[in-house]
Amino acid sequence: MDSRLNRIQSKMKLWIKDKNLSNPSIPLKVLNKSFRSSRQSSVSNGHGLYSLDRDETESLMSSHEASNAGISLDSSFRVIQVGQPEPQYGNNAVTNTKYDLFTFLPKCLYEQFRYFYNMYFLLVSLSQLIPPLKIGYLSTYIAPLIFVLLITLTKEAVDDLKRRRRDSYANNEIYTVNDSPCAAQNIQAGDVVYIAKDQRIPADMILLETTVGNEAFIRTDQLDGETDWKLRIPCSNQHTEGIVHADAPIKSVHHFYGTFTLNNQKRPISVDHTLWANTVLASDGVYGVVVYTGKDTRQSMNSSKAKTKVGLLEKEINFYSKILCTFVLVLSIGLTFSHGIKTDWYISVFRYLILFSSIIPINLRVNLDLAKIVHSKNTESDPNLPGVVVRSSNIPEELGRIEYVLTDKTGTLTQNEMEMKKLHVGTMGFSAESMDVVQACIQNYSTPIPLSEDSKTLVRNLVLALSLCHNVTPSKGHDGVVSYQAASPDEVAIVKWTSTLGLVLTNRTRDAITLNNNVYKILNIFPFKSETKRMGIIVQSPDEKITFYLKGADSIMQNFVKPSFWLEEECGNLAREGLRTLVVAKKDLSAEEYSAFSLAHSDASLSFSNSRDKKMEEIVSRYLENDMDLLGLTGVEDKLQKDVKITLELLRNAGIHVWMLTGDKVETARCIAISSRLVSRGQYIHTINQLSSREEAHNHLLTLRNKPDSCLIIDGESMEFCIGYLQNEFIDIVSDLSSVVICRCTPTQKANMTRLIQEKKQASVCCIGDGGNDVGMIQVANVGIGIVGKEGQQASLAADYSVKEFSHVSRLLLWHGRISYKQTSKLAMFVIHRGLLISVCQVVYSVISAFEPIALFQGLLLVGYSTMYTMLPVFSIVYDRDVSEKLVFLFPELYKEMREQKCFSYKNFISCVLISVYQGLIIQLFTFYLIGFEEEGKMLAVCFSCLIFNELIMVALQINTWEQTIVMSELLTLMMYILSVPFLTNYFELKFLLGLKFYWVSALILFISLLPVWCGKALKRKLKPSSYAKLQR
């Protein structure tokens, strides 16, 4: 064995030299490790599984090549015995929950005490256990903190229970495993699973056997975003025995390396034999053996771990809380030392810190959490958003701060339903309304529009070519209804269309196609490849004529057909309509011509060199792909979701950059970008595809810099190239474009691009998708929106918001997002204002009290001020509306204006602080001046009453629309205060409250306190009104 290993290492060295690899030691280590692993596997399993031959050496080479290309690949093979469960690889349970029974409390408490103001109040509360620092009652400080934590813990528990229920639904889906029913979560590696048609594949499997035919199709749009169905080949013709050697789990959905051994005969298996988890079987039932489960599946490895999202507003409030705390600390030290240095000065500092703790209000957390709940419930109860589900109530205000929307294409912007829309033959064009003319040509009866025989022949030839040049297989269901299976929905749409014209595909085998009762022999078939952008077939008709048919992208096909004056122009017309265009051509072959081609092609296919595919393509090009007869063009429409065009226009007008990230081909994405109006009419489209050098990338970016209004279409590999070499320049230029389309984009690339925008642009990003391949970016985004898809609910379950269709996004952002951000910001400002106001009064009282840290308000007054006396009016702000729904959608620019001005900005914060300081000084100083310092009962009655009424009037001055809830909260609070006064005899002098002096003093103080605020507001509306204020007029 060692001699064979040395021989293979020698070959590896030659291969390394050929590949110009920079680190030749890696593949030898990989080979040694894999050889040892395989040898141990052979001994432990009692099978002579590994005699390292050429195929295995190439497999190991490919493994390193994949690793060198950036695929994280461990070459330790896992051995799977068909039908023998392997519990050591773990179960197949899906989990999106954040907590379990043991981690809930510590994790939640950690999340809460990450907020500075919560930690601050915890320390303040604990300080009351130290006798020298005790001020008033312990419950005055500890009760609000406990209340805040209980509200938050309850909300988190409810949200996580909902996630657990959703996971339970997916985990308990029943499958037939080893001929017995089994829940999806209990499936293990080694199990043989039967998958029925249209059933979701629960784990990564190797296809063993098909029940009908010898091939299967899967839909992968929920995994990689590609709309084309994928052909899969069984590696056996039975499902009861065999051994699979598979490489370690990797992220790449396009690579797989392994072998399948049956009766001591070993054969290589590749990605063509795989059934990845979360894809859907599109053909008849199959049997597969499970290789990877749970977190080891491609789907899970391409998904980001769920994290607790924190809104930007929360971070801003946390920052300003630290500023206020610093101010409190400086103020406390200043007041302590302003009256001389005492031996116990530190106790005075701490007592001042506790007295002024209201500056950082503990109930800010409660108010914000309750506001989030209210906004979330309003969203869910919106009759214009049927089926919307708020899965995370932590970030409703983030909906109002979105700068970038990154959206998937398949199932999000489109319905993934293809429809034949246009046909172009020579100078004749046929739309959907005039297809009866085409049908008349096919069925040889008189056409509604007179056509010459030559024209009719051209139409027949084109339709016949479309009926034959495809990979579609008909399948009859149990109900007798015929369905079509293919690797491309375009082909299915075209075949369905030709069947309506009378050319019905009734049967297909590997060797023949049957149209009605006519059998056409398949001599050769050349499958579609993204690199070649075309698909061809050679058939022999019932009358022995041999014809080569070819269809593909216009950019490629124009090189193969005879010169045409109309081809380029008509292709451009169809593309501008957003249709997926195919050029169709044919070439008649004599028996001698076909024989010569067949011999040359066969010789090329037997080549063992790495250039075998290239040689075969050269033969096809030399013998077939030249001087072909142009038959015509087809235009297929990928139907858009409802109101997609309107929604995208609204988002753009709101100043939001819209990007489309898709796993689909460049041509397909380009068509959808045009048809959805993501690209405006006449807008310049710049395409970057298959970049190979830094100079080329730099030139592309230079072009884009000079054309900021253009749309960029770029493939995933080119994007990775730009990020790797020119990251800052790439992000700076691309982020300013009006629209960007990224094609051939993997789930990991989607998530990475989201992170880049967040980090480099410090912008809020909203990601929208409907498939499992979108989960990663949805979890990374500031706000993730999942659309309930036809193929599953993975994106919907992982998202913060779940909606039924893409058109709901505009309402979610422009209406609910704007309200949430604006009103929550205003609420936070008022809570801070309320805390500062009472703290300023306390500062004035301490100064007048010879700088002693004595409490002005204690007990019920201190607790009641921020709860039953002011909480309802202040909280009612969340129900205010500055403009109507109609105006928001008529003027989406309001969204952009609000986001750019920032509701919770330095300017607004400083304004809030100055107003609070001014009003606090006026209330406390004028109370002392007009009432006196000695009569504490009278002084407290006036001062506290002015604080309450000042807050009620301040709220009233800020209200734009007097909703019933707001009016009731003001009146109810006023009544509660009046009715509670008789119970405040320990603090107030009740006889004074009944006298005239109390009323005129209070009225005078309130007038002086509120007059500047009212005047400032009136002047601003007059001289520099905001856009919404103008609309209110």
UniProtKB/Swiss-Prot annotation:
Top-rank lineage group of the source organism: Eukaryota
Membrane spanning stretches: 133-153, 274-294, 317-337, 344-364, 768-788, 843-863, 913-933, 939-959, 965-985, 992-1012
Chain sites annotated for binding ATP: 408-410, 491, 528, 530, 533, 551, 580-581, 662-664, 744, 750, 773-774
Catalytically driven reaction(s): ATP + H2O + phospholipidSide 1 = ADP + phosphate + phospholipidSide 2; a 1,2-diacyl-sn-glycero-3-phospho-L-serine(out) + ATP + H2O = a 1,2-diacyl-sn-glycero-3-phospho-L-serine(in) + ADP + phosphate + H(+); a 1,2-diacyl-sn-glycero-3-phosphoethanolamine(out) + ATP + H2O = a 1,2-diacyl-sn-glycero-3-phosphoethanolamine(in) + ADP + phosphate + H(+)
Membrane topology qualifier: Multi-pass membrane protein
CDD domains for this protein: P-type_ATPase_APLT_Neo1-like
Co-factor requirement: Mg(2+)
EC number: 7.6.2.1
Major localisation: membrane
Role according to the record: Flippase that catalyzes the hydrolysis of ATP coupled to the transport of lysophosphatidylserine, phosphatidylethanolamine, and phosphatidylserine from the lumenal to the cytosolic leaflet of the Golgi apparatus membrane and ensures the maintenance of asymmetric distribution of phospholipids.
The protein's assembly and partners: Functions without a CDC50/LEM3 family accessory subunit.
Protein name in UniProt: Phospholipid-transporting ATPase neo1
Originating organism: Schizosaccharomyces pombe (strain 972 / ATCC 24843)
